[in-house]
Amino acid sequence: MLGGVEVEGIAGMPLLLPLRPYRTLEEAVSGLGGKVVRAASRDVPLVVVGDGREDADRAFAVRTTFDGWAGGIVPVRAQGLRLAERQEFILSGVLSGAVAVAEAFQHLRGGNPAAGRRNVGLSLWRPEADWREPQTVGPVITRLPSALWLIGIGNVGQAYMWALGLLPYENPNEVQLVLQDYDMLAPSNDSTSLLTQPTVIGARKTRAIADWAEKRGFRTAIIERRFASDFRVGADDPAVALCGVDNALARSALEDAGFSRVIEAGLGYGIRDYLGFRTHVFPGSRRAHDIWRTEESGREVRTDLPAYQALEATGADQCGLTKLAGRTVGAPFVGAVAAAVVVGELLRMVNGGHAYELIDGHLRNLDHRTVVRAAEGQPFNPGSTEAERAAKRDRRSTATEFQPYACVGATPLALVPNGG
């Protein structure tokens, strides 16, 4: 959203999420690049959060909704379609917010007349089922992961960290994270990656994101080398890896490093598939070597499109254009959806739940997705620590009830509490 984000009616609202150094919601919105206003712009699409006023006369007006592990959006005009919104689960909030932005983006970009006029959502507990069904709510989480290795700290890797950083840890200092990447943050990362701001451009990705994680209270270690087939982890290293690299060679080596489990996500590429995401869990029925050898050989690279032709006219070589055209497109809201799915997979693992070896979805139409449940494997303890109890979070809140609404648009997004 090039016009930024407008947020209305949040004066004095407490911040209940662990986002240092911010203490209030207003501080967090301003610090993260939003614009706190008295009255949100009227000529932008609307996203309603909670029980706020509806303004349903807009061309685009949707409401976020959740219950437990299920989250998504429904049109404001469609009464009675909200979920129960009783059971808190951070990842369903991440998911529903990202889906709302994806719908607004498609509405503004054009090409999808259904955007904003439909129900869109997913259950992270039962992704193969209808997210509005009661059985998709899932259980209350009592344990959270305590040791993880993150491979790649770009768009997807930073989305993982954002989701992990919002989880309600009782003792975040019990969490050990290893961050592996060899690259530096570039200006393009500011618009594609959730934790990149202009102040850290030029820094090593590992160091900038480790700093963010340590402010959250996590313990970190960094590895500044490429992940490749000759890389091995030790017995004392985290047994679970989350992979977010956009590199077939590295992804094909995921099962060679010695991790007990690997959960990875990739995003779509090109103007047709930039809204796509696909997650894998290893070990699975297919080897990583076989998956990426097949996918790379079948990938179509379109350097004949106008943007690439314009670059060629300025002197760009064909080899470079081919590499650029074959890269994934970094829409941060797609990365956030993928992160919710991956971290949801991780939380099911930590709490002894079932697993899915493949989840393949597309935000143009999330109903058309492929979900493959994993075979029952050997019992596995990835390491865990206690989740904060809901009663403790409730005591941190004030008597002010936060029931907001929000607007998203080519100019801004806005957030307004009930009666604001």
Short names for language-model regions:
Residues 220-222:
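Hydrophobic/aromatic anchor residues within beta-strands of the central parallel beta-sheet
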